[in-house]
């Protein structure tokens, strides 16, 4: 896939804040987890005015938009609860932009997943986390 609007290379380690570095590490851990389960990376950190798509992977014939969430504790519902309806709508609009840019009018089967990375390194992969 060519670099351009809506894509960027793997996370940088330069002048990143500790929170950004932790987020980069969570995304990388989530990607390894997904790849270990047969997914193939299509794009990462695709940015649009509506928001950022953390990971885009292909699982068999399905294009999967993956939101990676990291939380230090399960307080306030944990990582999964932080993907509220507002965030879901932003992700859906960003995904529409990505699909139009990369797939034109022939959209593949798609879904939205959430990978929750806990502070202790455990992960929960929520397939079909929400519908758009």
Go through each PLM region and give its residues.
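Metal-dependent nuclease catalytic cores in nucleic-acid-processing enzymes
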Residues: 92-104
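Short acidic/glycine-enriched loop/turn segments that link adjacent beta-strands
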Residues: 49-51, 120
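Hydrophobic residues on conserved beta-strands that form the core of alpha/beta folds
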Residues: 41-43, 65, 112
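Residues forming the ATP-binding cleft of Hanks-type serine/threonine protein kinase domains
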Residues: 46, 69, 129-130
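Domain-level recognition of nuclease-like catalytic cores that cleave nucleotide substrates
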Residues: 4-6, 101-132
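Acidic-basic catalytic patches of nuclease active cores, encompassing PD-(D/E)XK
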Residues: 1-44
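Conserved catalytic cores of phosphodiester-cleaving nucleases, focusing on short active-site segments
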Residues: 34, 53-78, 83, 91
